[in-house]
Amino acid sequence: MARYIGPKTKIACRFGELIFGPDKAFSIRNSSSSRRKKKTSEYGIQLREKQKAKYIYGVLENQFRGFFEKASRSRGITGVVLLQLLESRLDNLVYRMGLAKTRAEARQLVSHKHITIDNNVVNIPSYLVKPGQIIGVRERAKSLEIILDNLIRANHNKYSWIEYDKSSMSARYLYIPERMDIPENIKEQLIVELYSK
């Protein structure tokens, strides 16, 4: 399956929530939709939750399964560890820092070699950042309008596990967030049940 690049509103309406962030068209389409909902099977509910998580984090099936397998081999609750791994992805942390409006935009910044880890350029969006590492903006990218505009609007104190330094346009990944800290509306246990079949 290829990465979805179609209208985000259509997907958000399917799940009945703003999984991609603010969307003016969402409330209009969602309120005007009067389709009768069919009763969904247990498998359907679990599959839907997995698809929602994949859309939110912009991860394809093979990668998502790889994260699940890694989580299932780890100590701790598999579903929680899965979300913690997704939260530790470089593209997600660039998004959480406020350098990008969306994770898709963050992925582009990473792929175009605008982002560094401990002063080394990393262009792999799925790179897993370790606590203590510093995510920065490459010197030549610090004047990019898209980054500057996003930083003006960003709330740098929103996530306690990211310590942002305005002067250097960088942030330290302090610690892996607990489940209660992760704001995404995902029922991770349903995903665990789906993969455990």
UniProtKB/Swiss-Prot annotation:
One of its GO terms (biological process) is ribosomal small subunit biogenesis. SMART domains: Ribosomal_S4, S4. GO terms for cellular component: small ribosomal subunit. Residues 88-150 form the S4 RNA-binding domain. It comes from the Bacteria. Belongs to the universal ribosomal protein uS4 family. One of the primary rRNA binding proteins, it binds directly to 16S rRNA where it nucleates assembly of the body of the 30S subunit. Part of the 30S ribosomal subunit. Contacts protein S5. The interaction surface between S4 and S5 is involved in control of translational fidelity. This is Small ribosomal subunit protein uS4. It comes from Azobacteroides pseudotrichonymphae genomovar. CFP2. The gene is rpsD.
